[in-house]
Amino acid sequence: MIKKFTSAIIFIAFIFSVCVSAAPSPGDSSLCSVVVEAESGDIIFEKNAHERRGPASTTKIMTALVALENSRTDDIVKIDPRAVGTEGSSAYLCAGEKVLLSDLLYAVMLGSANDAAAAIAYHIGGSIEGFAEMMNARAEKLGLSDTHFENPHGLDGESHYTTAYDLAMIAREALKNENFRNIVSTKTKAVKLSDGNVTRVFKNHNRLLFEYDDIIGVKTGFTKKCGRTLVSAAERDGVTVICVTLCDGDDWRDHRTVSYTHLTLPTKLEV
């Protein structure tokens, strides 16, 4: 028996166009957006998808990918003093304490902890700049010419930028990593800090995880300069759709539109 898929993109595009006739499209509120089918990388919908914008904390998708590819989840990370007190969301790490890399990744991807992202950077890259070079090398390996990182957390920088399309491709690559998928699809996680003496519970900032069973991630972001940024992914019957919006004041609505559309996707057929 020969197995083949129906033309997923044709079906997705058709259903998407039908659904959004009665609901907002994912581009209504965003300056830049894209929806892609993960397996092929084909674009289903786009709006200024190749315009360079600040990614804010969606930067951390690449941070986690580089960390997982260059270290072990059971590695013990000694917190570098330079990571402590990093501006923005925080895990309130203390200099010298020892934390599992996996716990730092949960703090980064669920709690958006900037100090945890910095701690990972110092541990793996030796410095913020060194780790950013690793992130940029990984982006280059993916063929992404409109992405450049200055840091692992997404705080604003003059040469810290990406595009909706590039960010979708980064998420697409990251979702191939089983550890990454497990982390970003987790709703809440208790992690051990202060050398195991303190337990802190991180709740995923991605509210879509709590609304739809098919949502599998990925990451929220915000700075005053970048506005609201969001990368989400939904999966059903082996088809995964990734949605990215940048500078979107109504991102939850826009991503719900895509999720609703995805719930009506056809299954794979066998001939």
For each of these PLM feature ranges, what is it?
Residues 1-9:
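Bacterial N-terminal signal peptides that target proteins for export
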Residues 9-17:
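Bacterial N-terminal signal peptides
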Residues 21-165, 169-178:
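Active-site-adjacent loops and short helices of periplasmic peptidoglycan-processing enzymes
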Residues 144-145, 156-263:
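Domain-terminus/edge residues, biased toward the C-terminal soluble/receptor-binding domains
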Residues 262, 267-271:
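Single conserved hydrophobic/aromatic residue that forms the stacking wall/gate
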